[in-house]
């Protein structure tokens, strides 16, 4: 079977955005997982920033991974992937000029689409980890991303957090990102269908939701009717891999180790608790 080019895969992603149903992403974190996802029939894979940090650095999601490290992992994945890969590009690794570099590098890696979020990253001294940058700065990042894009088929998605700001600000930000030219809007923190409908009714671009498996948002037909095209349920495949590795090695060693679940394992082996203490001690950052 002939291989699809990166341009072909980007065009396929565009077709998904223009379809009349929603698609659930597969968490792809290395070349093997990308091949498995495509073979099982997933239409889209996602390389999450948190998963990339764990996979590359064994570090928690504290914006420790560099653009170069993230791009290297994306390149490995896209070298073999025969499904569109969506990159969680966090805040674009800096200001609007850094966003341009991020888009250029990820496009060259073969990514089909990427999200640029308006979270204040990395967290600043004395600020909450969920604080957002100003709307005008965020719009500048979207415009810069579009300027840096060479292949017009690659989708630029503006992301905001509906769980930490009020309804009117969510609408204002999403509409501003649409006006700036974003190909879709990614929403985090949607609570239920009433919450989603109140926002979706004010927007015109396709929507992407990060739900983390929220049981209140599991009706695919209703999601599609509200304009949702991409759903990210989380990264269960990655955490299942961590759990399987731990269980296999524990059995092989025949040691009396604790039977930890995937979440406990990721916290333990990424030394996440240390980073929380350091952030509070040296930066006065609170979760």
Swiss-Prot record:
Subunit-structure text: Homotetramer; dimer of dimers.
Protein name: Oxaloacetate decarboxylase
Binding site for Mg(2+): 88
Catalytic activity reported: oxaloacetate + H(+) = pyruvate + CO2
Keywords: Decarboxylase, Lyase, Magnesium, Metal-binding
Record-listed substrate binding positions: 50, 159, 235
Molecular function via GO: magnesium ion binding; methylisocitrate lyase activity; oxaloacetate decarboxylase activity
Cofactor(s) annotated in UniProt: Mg(2+)
Bound cofactor: record note: Binds 1 Mg(2+) ion per subunit.
EC number: 4.1.1.112
Pfam families xrefs: PEP_mutase (PF13714)
Matches recorded under InterPro entries: ICL/PEPM, Oxaloacetate_deCOase_bac, Pyrv/PenolPyrv_kinase-like_dom, Pyrv_kinase-like_dom_sf
Native organism: Stutzerimonas stutzeri (strain A1501) (Pseudomonas stutzeri)
Disulfide bridge map: none
Top class in the EC scheme: lyase
